[in-house]
C-alpha cells in the first residue's frame, strides 16, 4: 500500500525526489505521514481539498480488503 501511495503522489508533484512517506503502524491502524516540497503541498491538497480526499478514498478502499484502518497526514516541512 505504501508503494501505491508513493506512486500516486510522485506523479502529482513537480519534485518527486522530495516525496517522503513514513508508515506508522498500530493495532489494525496504519498512519502514513507524507512530506513533500513546500511548492507541491497545494497540488496534493487540490482545489477545496478534492485531490487529498480522492487519495484518502483510494487508500481506504485498498485497506478495507485487509480489514485495516488507514489514515493519511500531510506533514509540514521544517
From Swiss-Prot:
Single GO MF descriptor: RNA binding
Location (main, coarse): cytoplasm
Positions of the KH domain: 29-78
Origin superkingdom: Bacteria
Subcellular location as annotated: Cytoplasm
Any one of the GO CC terms: cytoplasm
Keyword Cytoplasm attributed: yes
Keyword Cell inner membrane: no
Keywords: Cytoplasm, RNA-binding
Recorded family membership: Belongs to the KhpA RNA-binding protein family.
Functional summary from the UniProt entry: A probable RNA-binding protein.
Name of the protein described by the UniProt record: RNA-binding protein KhpA
Gene source species: Chlamydia muridarum (strain MoPn / Nigg)
Gene: khpA
Amino acid at each position: 500500500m505504501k508503494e501505491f501511495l508513493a506512486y500516486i503522489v510522485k506523479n502529482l508533484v513537480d519534485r518527486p525526489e522530495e516525496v517522503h512517506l513514513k508508515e506508522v503502524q498500530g493495532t489494525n491502524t496504519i498512519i502514513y505521514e507524507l512530506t513533500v516540497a513546500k511548492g507541491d503541498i497545494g497540488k496534493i491538497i487540490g482545489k477545496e481539498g478534492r485531490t487529498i480526499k480522492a487519495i484518502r478514498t483510494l487508500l481506504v478502499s485498498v485497506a478495507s480488503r485487509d480489514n485495516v484502518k488507514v489514515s493519511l497526514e500531510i506533514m509540514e516541512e521544517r
